Amino acid sequence: MATLFIADLHLCSEEPAITAGFLRFLAGTAREADALYILGDLFEAWIGDDDPEPLHREIAAALRALVQSGVPCYFIHGNRDFLLGRRFARESGMQLLPEEQVLDLYGRRVLIMHGDTLCTDDAGYQAFRAKVHKPWLQTLFLALPLRLRRRIAARMRAGSKASNSQKDLAIMDVNPQAVVDTMERQQVQWLIHGHTHRPAVHTLEANGKPAHRVVLGAWHSEGSMVKVTPDNVELVAFPF
């Protein structure tokens, strides 16, 4: 009996080893879970559900096979794949969740999220996020020809990489007060998120009691997951 959480795989055709590792995970470890939650940035980029990229079809088929085996799969958007929509969700069998979701896991109230909204010290990113999450702008972008969307996305990724290389690493991590405020607003003692690529289990105080923040690692040279059971919450790194 276990519920699994993953995030930040950044799947793309240029990283076939990560894709292969994820497919093995879906066909193996994930089949034993009560449920699988993907907390954003499953893909390196997402320019629309109508993108015919073969990788997307391959991943959708593998996720659907997991769901059809009896393991429900849930998805929270990340900062890379926030345009992933209902069409892909139907194709893959995933259920889309809001950016903050509270779960009752074996008697624990656990808040799950991607985590980028906690990085409030990075004012430039938060302003950009607010802009690209405007529904009218998303509708306009998705109406553009695929070729143009690809060019825009590539330019934005290059700009993001250049910008991040100039930023202090500290401002790209979560703001501690934002974490406490979010946990107290949701009345939880457990938070699981990704985004920062800094896997760790942090202890803090929220709601006047000890609390825990579990940060998922990115899938680079190895996989990362959080395994929640009735007795334990464990951050696990594993080979592909």
Curated annotation (Swiss-Prot):
**Membrane topology, from the record:** Peripheral membrane protein
Molecular function GO labels: manganese ion binding; UDP-2,3-diacylglucosamine hydrolase activity
Pfam families xref list: Metallophos
Q: What is its EC number?
A: 3.6.1.54
What is a biological process (GO) this protein takes part in? lipid A biosynthetic process
Q: Which amino acid positions bind substrate, per UniProt? A: 79-80, 122, 160, 164, 167, 195
Binding sites annotated in the UniProt record for Mn(2+) 1: 8, 10, 41, 197
How many cofactor units bind, and how?
Binds 2 Mn(2+) ions per subunit in a binuclear metal center.
Q: Which reaction does it catalyse?
A: UDP-2-N,3-O-bis[(3R)-3-hydroxytetradecanoyl]-alpha-D-glucosamine + H2O = 2-N,3-O-bis[(3R)-3-hydroxytetradecanoyl]-alpha-D-glucosaminyl 1-phosphate + UMP + 2 H(+)
Source organism's superkingdom?
Bacteria
The positions annotated for binding Mn(2+) 2 are 41, 79, 114, 195
What does the UniProt function comment say about this protein? Hydrolyzes the pyrophosphate bond of UDP-2,3-diacylglucosamine to yield 2,3-diacylglucosamine 1-phosphate (lipid X) and UMP by catalyzing the attack of water at the alpha-P atom. Involved in the biosynthesis of lipid A, a phosphorylated glycolipid that anchors the lipopolysaccharide to the outer membrane of the cell.
Q: What name does this protein carry?
A: UDP-2,3-diacylglucosamine hydrolase
Q: What is the lineage of its organism?
A: Bacteria, Pseudomonadati, Pseudomonadota, Gammaproteobacteria, Enterobacterales
Underlying gene: lpxH
